[in-house]
């Protein structure tokens, strides 16, 4: 079992229940999924860039990403409907907790000039979204083998009903907020 999942079940659940004043154990907020998204806008002109993004995402997430397609043609961005423009991965269960553990303990400390995540990035329903500017903060990525620096969006979906519950959940996991 993942280290973070064991810690959540054994100590963090009770701490959250007491902190939020919840009586029913099924109401305690938990993380349901983590979605990683990498938009590769330049893939419209160079298809090889998307292959590199898919390879990086597969190393980071531990599972094969799905290629996302443009929903409509936009002349200003020089893309057509149905063209591949990015990739995404949805992590659940054990892989989700393993990724979250690596993110909190290894990747976040390696971010340059990091002062904490914004606590305003909650969506109003307890879900948190953040962006990373470079994929090289993850130890799985070999700096010498990447073709270019790419960023990614990370969305953490929770069962929390409010932003305060979501913020409390993320703080107990060890997320550094400003």
From Swiss-Prot:
Pfam families: Ribosomal_L5, Ribosomal_L5_C. The keyword Oxidoreductase does not apply. GO terms for cellular component: ribonucleoprotein complex; ribosome. It comes from the Bacteria. One of its GO terms (molecular function) is rRNA binding. SUPFAM superfamilies: RL5-like. Disulfide bonds: none annotated. Keywords: Ribonucleoprotein, Ribosomal protein, RNA-binding, rRNA-binding, tRNA-binding. One of its GO terms (biological process) is translation. The keyword rRNA-binding applies. InterPro entries: Ribosomal_uL5, Ribosomal_uL5_bac-type, Ribosomal_uL5_C, Ribosomal_uL5_CS, Ribosomal_uL5_dom_sf, Ribosomal_uL5_N. Part of the 50S ribosomal subunit; part of the 5S rRNA/L5/L18/L25 subcomplex. Contacts the 5S rRNA and the P site tRNA. Forms a bridge to the 30S subunit in the 70S ribosome. PANTHER family: 60S RIBOSOMAL PROTEIN L11-RELATED. This is one of the proteins that bind and probably mediate the attachment of the 5S RNA into the large ribosomal subunit, where it forms part of the central protuberance. In the 70S ribosome it contacts protein S13 of the 30S subunit (bridge B1b), connecting the 2 subunits; this bridge is implicated in subunit movement. Contacts the P site tRNA; the 5S rRNA and some of its associated proteins might help stabilize positioning of ribosome-bound tRNAs. Belongs to the universal ribosomal protein uL5 family. This is Large ribosomal subunit protein uL5. It comes from Acinetobacter baylyi (strain ATCC 33305 / BD413 / ADP1).
């Amino acid at each position: 079992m993942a280290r973070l999942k064991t810690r959540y079940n054994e100590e963090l659940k009770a701490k959250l229940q007491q902190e939020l004043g919840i009586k029913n154990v099924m109401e305690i907020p938990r993380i349901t999924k983590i979605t990683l998204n990498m938009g590769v806008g330049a893939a419209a002109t160079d298809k090889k860039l998307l292959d590199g993004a898919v390879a990086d995402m597969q190393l980071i997430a531990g599972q094969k990403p799905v290629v996302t397609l443009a929903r409509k043609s936009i002349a200003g961005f020089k893309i057509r409907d149905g063209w591949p423009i990015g990739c995404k991965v949805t992590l659940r269960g054990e892989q989700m907790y393993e990724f979250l553990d690596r993110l909190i303990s290894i990747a976040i400390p390696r971010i340059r000039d990091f002062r904490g995540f914004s606590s305003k990035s909650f969506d109003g329903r307890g879900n948190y979204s953040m962006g990373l500017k470079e994929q090289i903060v993850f130890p799985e990525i070999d700096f010498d083998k990447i073709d270019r620096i790419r960023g990614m969006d990370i969305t953490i979906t929770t069962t929390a009903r409010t932003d305060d519950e979501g913020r409390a959940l993320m703080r107990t996991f060890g997320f550094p907020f400003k």
